[in-house]
Design a protein with these regions (language model features):
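N-terminal organellar transit peptides
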Residues: 1-87, 91-112
Length: 112
């Protein structure tokens, strides 16, 4: 992958695959780049494959909102770990799937 994400349109099906397999927002690629590429998807469905320890909260929130508000059907698939902001992105799916051996980590909430 050239970035922390990869988008593959699939000519044989109606589902595009999006892979978030690294630190969210790393390598000088921000949410705007991700969202700009997300807009190019022509398929009816989007599968977001996640294996990430997290990353930039602000980029992650923008990605969550873009996926949650997308007109396509979004399925998020935790394939290894969705930790920190990656767990928030995972919650953007219309359908959320996890393998039995996958991990989903959220931070301890705090309130005043």
């Amino acid at each position: 992958m050239k970035n922390w994400f990869e988008i593959q349109n699939n000519a044989e099906s109606e589902t595009a695959d999006v892979y978030i397999y690294s630190e969210v927002g790393g390598h000088d690629v921000n949410a705007k780049t991700f969202i700009d590429e997300l807009k190019t998807i022509k398929d009816k469905n989007i599968d977001v494959h996640i294996n990430s320890l997290g990353g930039s909260v602000f980029d992650g929130l923008a990605i969550y909102n873009a996926l949650k508000n997308h007109s396509k059907k979004v399925t998020t698939k935790v394939e290894g770990i969705a930790a920190s902001i990656a767990s928030v992105i995972a919650m953007a799916g219309d359908k959320i799937e996890m393998a039995e051996n996958s991990l989903f980590m959220i931070h301890n909430p705090f309130a005043s």
